[in-house]
């Protein structure tokens, strides 16, 4: 029983069950906010582009595909997309 319990604990620690990535999600110059990403989503992104309003910045979970002319930075650590 002790060996089985040890294996279960080691497995949980190694897999880090229940862990979710946290990313910033404020837009452009809004106050800084962040959110927990859905389970299995391990990336954060920061998209930046210019339009008639000026420079627009979008942040969130994942690493989306972007159109030409949009700068994209993806990263894989806590709150790395500011």
UniProtKB/Swiss-Prot annotation:
Disulfide-bonded cysteines: 23-44, 37-61, 63-74, 75-80
InterPro entries according to UniProt: Snake_3FTx, Snake_toxin-like_sf, Snake_toxin_con_site, Toxin_cobra-type
SUPFAM superfamilies documented for this protein: Snake toxin-like (SSF57302)
N-terminal signal peptide: 1-20
Keyword Disulfide bond listed: yes
Listed CDD domains: TFP_snake_toxin
Keywords assigned: Acetylcholine receptor inhibiting toxin, Disulfide bond, Ion channel impairing toxin, Neurotoxin, Postsynaptic neurotoxin, Secreted, Signal, Toxin
GO molecular function ontology, one term from the record: acetylcholine receptor inhibitor activity
GO cellular component terms, A-Z: extracellular region
Tissues and organs where the protein is expressed, per its UniProt entry: Expressed by the venom gland.
Localization per record: Secreted
Summary of the function given for this chain in its UniProt record: Binds to muscle nicotinic acetylcholine receptor (nAChR) and inhibit acetylcholine from binding to the receptor, thereby impairing neuromuscular transmission.
Family: Belongs to the three-finger toxin family. Short-chain subfamily. Type I alpha-neurotoxin sub-subfamily.
Record's protein name: Short neurotoxin OKI-10
Taxonomic source organism: Laticauda laticaudata (Blue-ringed sea krait)
């Amino acid at each position: 029983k002790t060996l089985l319990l040890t294996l279960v604990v080691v497995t949980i620690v190694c897999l880090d069950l229940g862990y979710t990535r946290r990313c910033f999600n404020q837009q452009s110059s809004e106050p800084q906010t962040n959110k927990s990403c859905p389970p299995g989503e391990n990336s954060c992104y920061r998209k930046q582009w210019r339009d008639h309003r000026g420079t627009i910045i979008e942040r969130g979970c994942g690493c989306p595909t972007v159109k030409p002319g949009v700068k994209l930075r993806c990263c894989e650590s806590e709150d790395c997309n500011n």
